[in-house]
Amino acid sequence: MGQETNMLNAHQQLVRTSSGRPGHDKRQQTPGTATGLLKLLSSTPYAEQRSLGSGDGVIHAQKQRSRSAGQTPKKDRRLRGRNKKGQSSAEAEDVVPSSPRKPSFPFQWAWESFTTDGRALHQPSSVLAPGHQALPLPLAVHHHKSRRKSTPALPEAHSFCWKTEEPNLERRQQLRACSCTSIPPGRGTSQELEPSGEGGLQSPRKSSGSGLEPEESEPEGLGAEEAERGLIPGELPQLPRRGLILEEEQFSEATEEAEDGEHRAPWRRRTSSRRKGRNSGEEAWEESEVRRLESVSSSTNLREPQRRKPRAKELEGPWDLEKLQRKLQQELDCGPEKQPWKSLRAAVQASNWSRKAHPLGDDETFLFANFPNRTFHKRQEATRNLLRAWELQQREEQQQAEVRRAREQRVQHQVARCLAAYAPRGSRGPGAAQRKLEELRRQERQRFVEYQAELQGIQHRVQARPYLFQQAMQANARLNVTRRFSQVLSALGLDEEQLLAKAGKRDMEGAPRRHRSHRSVGARMEPSSQSPPKMEPTGSQADQHFAPNPDQELSP
């Protein structure tokens, strides 16, 4: 058992050194690592060593290598899977040393040989070329390798292709068989995959120490890798296209997730059985909490109908604006030395507390006072906003009253100044304004009497001349007749002035009357009120005087 533990530790050390230092070649590793590899090779049974040349043996070795590489982190394996295209060319040649790659899934090399190099399936043989090995091997080494002659690569490649498509049932059965060994509790996650490694490392044979064993392991590992990939040692693999790379990465990720789930399934079963003991106490505590919360909720449901009634009363009390206004008026009437709003706020809060304390118990009132909830804060904020609005309204009313009083005083001062301007200089006593007012009233009465007298005179004049329109029509008719007479005289070639002079000699009184008839229309439209009846005889005399004159002139 101690020897198996030593071999297992050596196997873990080999995996860690190969995954931690990918830049070094296997030939440049420390002798301890080579010794560990030799122990691993020597620990395999003889039946497996005989079957190394066939495809099944290579697949079994590939499974062992994939299990050992399964301990590496998943992130590092994905990064190496993405960068594995640039590192896979120079491993087959001994001239250019390169780092060995760790497979990201069990059949990675077979998948690469199938996708990248199509010639691997159609070549007649991909046997290792004799004499191409870099280091000459002794007779013992050749004798040891003669037992393991490799078969042609064509059936190996076909077996790889068919093995990649078979389901994971065989791998699951192997992992379940390997995980039957007991895992001691308290070990880290890096040791979860150790039973699967132990199942493949158990063998009845023991390693025989010889000086040629470190040299044998290196070419043998290279030959196995070349046989697995199905490549000729002299040629380099071709890089696949981008679509093939993406398909390969997706397939590798799916295979890795399936492997991780299979490896962790037994450990999860054990951890779930261990957690059951812990969860039992937690479930009991949660059940007690649920019962307590249900009891509290039932008690609150019983108290809810008791709380709804006082809430309705609360909305009637503190929000009644009339009561608040009456309280405010009482505080204002008490005097300006008090602060009414502070006392009103205290009274409202006291009324709220008294109403809440009546329906609720003393304990709940104490809790409510010590632990105010969100509703309490909202109610307080609403009360403060209401009182603030009332204060603002009262201030506005006070300001308006002050402005109104100031306006009244200003108007009174203006009236006093106007009265003082009309008052005599000698009268500056207290009765001067009254005397000035009486004087103004007397003057107003006098002006009213004069206006009434003027209106009466106008009324008398209108009533004394009821035919004024007829008189105006008669004056217009006389003017038209005179104009027509002048036109007739001018048409006959008679001089109106000479004719009027001759007529005036006969009647001296008719000349001034005839001269008045030649006045303007405006002068005749303004008859004097003193002698209205003189107009008619004047017109009649003029007509009588003008009528015979043309007859007398035209008769000879």
Swiss-Prot record:
Keywords: Coiled coil. Residues 304-320 have a biased composition (Basic and acidic residues). Residues 75-85, 266-278 have a biased composition (Basic residues). GO terms for biological process: cilium organization. Residues 1-102, 180-320, 503-556 are annotated as: Disordered. Residues 387-463 form a coiled coil. Residues 1-20, 527-543 have a biased composition (Polar residues). This is Testis-specific protein 10-interacting protein. GO terms for cellular component: cytoskeleton; photoreceptor connecting cilium. Residues 213-225, 246-260 have a biased composition (Acidic residues). It comes from Bos taurus. The keyword Nucleotide-binding does not apply.
